[in-house]
Design a protein with these regions (language model features):
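TPR repeat positional signature
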Residues: 150, 188, 222, 229, ...
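Residue-level recognition of tetratricopeptide repeat
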Residues: 184, 218-219, 225, 263-270, ...
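Alpha-helical repeat scaffolds
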Residues: 128-132, 165-178, 202-213, 239-262, ...
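Residue at a conserved register position within TPR or TPR-like alpha-solenoid repeats
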Residues: 195, 229, 236, 279-281, ...
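Amphipathic alpha-helical "lid/sensor" segments that cap RecA-like P-loop NTPase cores
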Residues: 1-66
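C-terminal leucine-rich, beta-strand-based interaction scaffolds used for sensing/assembly
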Residues: 62-216, 220-223, 227, 247
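Polyanionic, low-complexity intrinsically disordered segments
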Residues: 188-189, 285, 313, 349
């Protein structure tokens, strides 16, 4: 329903994120007039040898990278043609690109992305690898204006949500970046997540442990490592392979410690969501009811959300756990949980919000 509160909030939120008035108008009007215009515009420029460079800019824009350093654009262009000239490219595509000192910005990115598909994984991988290699920090802990380009270009979550690459192609992308990016822990976290979603749990564990050796106190690293152990354990249990219970319990204990650790309090909601959701999945995979101690721990963590703003995903999880308790003779846990569940939701989030960044 486009007129529901949830739909209106999503539209307003998206418009506020736009830095391009045409993209904002496109989003708010469903964009058909703009789309028709730029479809004709793309057709007119279809034979242009610089078209792949424009496509590369659109792929990066879908990951939240709207502005690029001029030398990076030149590198991307020279991969397509040794004769590539940035000034000529800007002149040809002045409708959709502009240059400020040192940087090139893509405009109409949202519209163009709807017209330019993701059916060239080779070009997409090439583009993202070029961006990552150009923008990779010189050393761990260094952050400058290019760091966000590096992080967005290899973010598994962003790439999956954008629909640019399959999970197997994401792994291929990161395998090609090990040598130039191996000194940065963020790379190893993404490499680990990519291995995990491809079912390569041992590789994922190795990559994430390497990241932890570089940043032992990072929430992102510790959360990803604990989550991998739990997912790995459930995979083993569902396939009747190895000691899945041991793997899962090790990860669950680590996630619980993260959840109750005060220094990670800003990310409490993510830890609780992962811990409780995975225990419910464990119960389903093993066809075993949670023991009373585990159920009490889950309930206690959820009850502490009383002091945190709720979103729709947390509300849904609390409701799911209440139903679980009611169906498995643990009704004494329900009254306190219902008090939390009755708190009005403060905001709406998509499912992907709780995926590891």
């Amino acid at each position: 329903n486009p007129f529901s509160r949830q739909a209106r909030e999503k539209i307003i939120s998206q418009i506020m994120k736009e830095n391009d008035i045409i993209d904002a108008l496109y989003y708010s009007t469903e964009g058909e007039p703009f789309q028709r215009h730029y479809a004709r515009w793309l057709t007119k420029n279809a034979s242009d040898t610089d078209k792949k460079v424009l496509y590369s800019l659109c792929y990066l824009n879908r990951l939240g990278i709207a502005a690029l350093p001029n030398p990076l654009v030149a590198k991307i262009g020279q991969l397509q043609s040794r004769e590539f000239q940035l000034s000529s490219f800007v002149k040809k595509y002045s409708d959709v690109v502009s240059v400020s000192p040192g940087w090139l910005r893509l405009h109409r990115g949202r519209i163009l992305s709807t017209l330019i598909g993701a059916n060239d994984p080779e070009l997409i991988i090439q583009t993202l690898q070029q961006a990552a290699i150009y923008a990779v920090p010189a050393n761990e802990g260094r952050h400058d204006e290019r760091t966000s380009i590096f992080e967005r270009a290899i973010s598994v979550k962003r790439i999956r949500n954008s629909g640019l690459l399959s999970k197997n192609d994401i792994l291929t992308l990161l395998e090609g970046l090990e040598s130039p990016c191996k000194h940065v822990s963020y790379f190893w976290v993404q490499f680990g997540i990519a291995a995990q979603i491809n079912g390569e749990f041992e590789d994922a564990s190795n990559h994430l442990r390497y990241a932890k050796s570089m940043r032992p106190h990072s929430y992102q690293v510790n959360h990803a490592l604990a989550n991998n152990e739990m997912v790995w354990g459930i995979h083993l249990l569902s396939q009747n392979l190895g000691d899945g219970d041991s793997k899962f319990l090790h990860g669950a204990e680590a996630m619980y410690e993260i959840a109750v650790d005060g220094k990670f309090s800003k990310s409490y909601r993510y830890s609780v969501h992962s811990y409780v959701r995975m225990w419910l999945e464990h119960s389903k995979a093993t066809n075993r009811i949670l023991n009373k101690r585990t159920a009490q721990q889950c309930a206690a963590l959820l009850e502490k959300l009383f002091d945190h703003p709720l979103d729709n995903r947390l509300s849904s999880l609390i409701k799911q756990f209440i139903t679980y308790c009611e169906n498995h003779e643990m009704r004494e846990l329900v009254p306190s949980l219902k008090k939390v569940y009755k708190i009005p939701e403060r905001f709406h989030v998509e499912k992907e919000t709780y995926e590891i960044e």
